[in-house]
Swiss-Prot record:
Family annotation (HAMAP family): Coprogen_oxidas
Subunit relationships: Homodimer.
EC numbers: 1.3.3.3
GO BP terms: protoporphyrinogen IX biosynthetic process
Alphabetical UniProt keywords: Cytoplasm, Heme biosynthesis, Metal-binding, Oxidoreductase, Porphyrin biosynthesis
Subcellular location: Cytoplasm
Gene name in the database record: hemF
An annotated GO cellular component: cytoplasm
Location, primary (coarse class): cytoplasm
Record-marked site positions (Important for dimerization): H175
A Pfam short name: Coprogen_oxidas
Biochemical pathway: Porphyrin-containing compound metabolism; protoporphyrin-IX biosynthesis; protoporphyrinogen-IX from coproporphyrinogen-III (O2 route): step 1/1
Designated name of the protein: Oxygen-dependent coproporphyrinogen-III oxidase
The keyword Transmembrane helix appears for this protein: no
Amino acid sequence: MKPDAQRVKQFLLSLQDDICQQLAAVDGADFVEDSWQRDAGGGGRSRVLRNGGVFEQAGVNFSHVHGDAMPASATAHRPELAGRSFEAMGVSLVVHPLNPYIPTSHANVRFFIAEKPGAEPVWWFGGGFDLTPYYAFEEDAIHWHRTARDLCQPYGEDVYPRYKKWCDDYFFLKHRDEQRGIGGLFFDDLNTPDFDSCFRFMQAVGKGYTDAFLPIVERRKAMVWGERERHFQLYRRGRYVEFNLVWDRGTLFGLQTGGRTESILMSMPPLVRWEYDWQPEEGSPEAALSEFIKVRDWV
């Protein structure tokens, strides 16, 4: 069936509402909404919760942009898209908790369609979610990956292992030779077997994010932390910034398409520190993280 961009847009708007409601219920603070328009076509609504009881910053962004020609970042690996008009829409979010024992989480679901008269539309879905812990809790990693595996199961036995591997490969800091976190799911260019099946899978991933993340938040939010844990959290947040500014395709796409810079960089942690050649104390919980984030089968 023909791709229905309007149906996707309605789902994405309701997903943003749903995720914001669930995060606000856990935190107690409210999101502030900022609606924006893009001069070249489209717009979005950015929602940010700041300095809450649980989340130092949570940003949940919906955007829908369209234009007459594709940006260089998109046509580089898809030359057949040159000369087509395009629509790109998605929900993207990053949650930076205050408590260092709660991991940072990221999720994104998106839809893209490029058209030109007299030709079949080129379309695909993409998305996923991934987790960036500061302290190693095996049960959290297992729960996160079990949720990911279970939502993939109806779509085939090979779906979870394939998208887990893609996530591990994508969220990798080449210049540090380390993973960004413990991964999750990542998929892109999804357009088979048909529009409806792909759309259903994207919906499952979008809805699965809170099922994966919120039980971990509940488990960790009352844990007592101090200056040492905070110092380590801010240091490790530096890796998050490095990945987003150096390697992330979505950031590059947004900036190249004249997206709204404030919304694109909403994923940045509010506070972060770099320290020259810092090393954790041997045998410490901080030292355990480097082993913990290495790629492995969690379920």
